[in-house]
């Protein structure tokens, strides 16, 4: 049931990446584990259901020590915020790795206030295969005037890292 060396259950072995670098049993969602690899994070239930996210999909992760809760927000607003509650013995290595991996996936970022009054937020992100891509998020539906500023933001971000169109 468990790997001897680190007490990671065998059901956490990923067919693509092998055993996670670190993992921890969690209180909520019930009967689940959070596991992290250099390329991704997964919430895995004891029944074998997997919810996997590559690091570039994650906008931010924050730790509330009073609640013992890790809150993960995603770039895609359609993906519900993930709240992971730990028992009293939270895995500090796992928390550090989540933070470091999310930060590593963000190469650079910039913001621009748009003519419509909304804001565009852009960043160059890194996939697990080390390829780079642009993410642009806009706080409201862009107007025609906004589109020019958004294109300028994307161009500036690409120039920062030498990324072609």
Q: Which residue ranges define each predicted feature?
A:
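Eukaryotic intrinsically disordered, low-complexity regulatory linkers and tails enriched in Ser/Thr/Pro
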Residues: 1-165
